[in-house]
Swiss-Prot record:
This protein's UniProt keywords: Amino-acid biosynthesis, ATP-binding, Cytoplasm, Histidine biosynthesis, Hydrolase, Nucleotide-binding
GN (gene name): hisE
Pfam families xref list: PRA-PH (PF01503)
Protein name, per record: Phosphoribosyl-ATP pyrophosphatase
Pathway where this protein functions: Amino-acid biosynthesis; L-histidine biosynthesis; L-histidine from 5-phospho-alpha-D-ribose 1-diphosphate: step 2/9
Organism: Pseudomonas paraeruginosa (strain DSM 24068 / PA7)
GO molecular function: ATP binding; phosphoribosyl-ATP diphosphatase activity
Reactions catalysed according to its record: 1-(5-phospho-beta-D-ribosyl)-ATP + H2O = 1-(5-phospho-beta-D-ribosyl)-5'-AMP + diphosphate + H(+)
EC assignment: 3.6.1.31
Catalytic EC class: hydrolase
GO CC entries: cytoplasm
InterPro entries named in the record: HisE, PRib-ATP_PPHydrolase-like
């Protein structure tokens, strides 16, 4: 796992039980999962809009900024649910080299 991701995961974990007025992340945890999910949804939409704008203009700076926000809030969501980013990295590693079609077929229940 990257040093940045490791450090961020540690900070998020520290702030799970911090006073809500001590940081933005602590306030999100205090507001609960629904507020965190709302932020993930908001950042998802902003990322999509930034991608459309980047495709039209060729300028990807806003796309990078919004993607960072989306990743950040997704990490807050995982942490709120007791999950570590390493679990996502492990899942991506598991899928590496596996055909997307084969992976999807393996997930689908038999009819």
């Amino acid at each position: 796992m990257s040093d940045t991701l490791t450090r961020l995961a540690a900070v998020l974990e520290e702030r799970r039980n911090a006073a809500p007025d001590s940081s933005y992340v602590a306030s999100l945890y205090h507001k609960g999962l629904n507020k965190i999910l709302e932020k993930v949804g908001e950042e998802s939409v902003e990322t999509i809009i930034a991608a459309k704008d980047a495709a039209a203009s060729g300028d990807c700076q806003e796309l990078i900024y919004e993607t960072a926000d989306l990743w950040f809030h997704s990490l807050v969501m995982l942490s709120a649910l007791g999950q570590h980013p390493q679990a996502v990295l492990d899942e991506l590693e598991r899928r590496f080299g596996l055909s997307g079609h084969a992976e999807k077929a393996a997930r689908q229940p038999s009819a």
